[in-house]
């Protein structure tokens, strides 16, 4: 004896309506055998559609048993039920339920996407099915370009895509004219003859009369189950085998890639169909990413500018001062920094060059011009230590130090005050205090962060200054330049050890540009983090905007979600689709934000001449990662809501 394909016993379906329970199906017992063409007939509200939903695994019974090929559906989880819908059932709906943004081919092959069939195979089969149904010339037409009968035939092709072992037709002719209805019924009869099990749900006795078996349902109970003697249908056993084999096809290895591609395509279509809304959704992300990347670039540019300015006062330099630290009241009485210390330091391997320094202020006169200048009594290596370039004439030489020559190098500011642009200052004699001094060179102006660019400076041999102007032999400080590549900390420790031994006591302290650099880097990093944290708030607000719009999108596309679930989409497929959409919105918004930040950088360079924004790959990659994370975090809730939708309720939405 043939085993039933579908077996229902003592099945009940009860819905909660407020505080009351409504029994829609009551103790249903039913067996349907492979290859049968069955009509379930009843008036509106009789429970026939609810029964069809349970048969198609779109709904679960409240109690009782429902077996498919001997398998109890009550024990199956959501993904296993989706597999049954995908591999065994094909739905034909009264309102067609085609996706408006897909053409006939795309709608027909939808079930195969979730079954993991390769793109080429599903395209070939979809084209074959549509051609068999008389739609060969309409494959690339959207639903809005098809008649009702043509749309219904597309839905039949979709139902057959994965084999369609069981065809569930809900009022298949209800929205069609007489001729189209007859054509659809002819197709269903043909499918039955090919071996498909066809179950038609209808209120129309004329439609039911086309089936070989008629089941009447009223008030949730089966009141009649009879063979239709008027039916003269025959079933092709060979075709039934073909249908079953088609339904049992396994997923290809690249199935996940096909589903991902479909999800990506659907996300893109959803975004482009609401361009303004998508742009407004991106706006918060765009502003946030632009702000973060720009602020980090400004911070990095500012740090580089400050470092450059620090380097302008001496590259890799360590200064030695008398006393224990800044503000030491006894420092003025300490006179141990002398020329012998300079000579000793010069001989050390951790010293590139060294110069003493005594700073004083004097009045300088040339002809009828008198100005106050900073007098810098230094050694011959001063210009190397400080990285200054003598543009005219020559720098100080060791011979000048030895002979206590009354020569000076002036800066470009002093040159501008004393001499006309066309005059040659080299060899001119100026008065500093009451002593005559000969100008031997002009140093290039090297403005720095400490505002030295506007001062007037003069450099002279320390040996001459101590005897003719200052009247003391000890130095205000000694400045050491360390070799490139040598750690300042190593050199600093060597200097401290050497001078402590020479003086017998540590009566000095050191100050290096390295400590300034570290302080600057720490400060700029702190400020960048502070301002970036404010910009991140914009990103969070943008993420909330993405979540809100995605929730709206889920509501708008509820029917689409129901259709996808009906053809076999898993909850994970729906979750993936909406997550991809959220991530795409955020990634594109992040990309636009990065491009805008480059625009901000170009504008910044026009407005601020002495500083450039510095864009780093790390900041840009971080922005992209941040955009993706926002998409995942704020897109998860809407995506989860979409995946948890009840397919029956989703299909009922308009």
UniProtKB/Swiss-Prot annotation:
Coarse class of the protein's main subcellular location: membrane
Entry similarity comment: Belongs to the ABC transporter superfamily. Macrolide exporter (TC 3.A.1.122) family.
Protein name: Macrolide export ATP-binding/permease protein MacB
ABC transporter domain boundaries: 6-244
A single GO BP: response to antibiotic
Matches recorded under InterPro entries: AAA+_ATPase, ABC3_permease_C, ABC_transporter-like_ATP-bd, ABC_transporter-like_CS, MacB-like_ATP-bd, MacB_PCD, Macrolide_Exporter_MacB, P-loop_NTPase
Keywords, alphabetical: Antibiotic resistance, ATP-binding, Cell inner membrane, Cell membrane, Membrane, Nucleotide-binding, Translocase, Transmembrane, Transmembrane helix, Transport
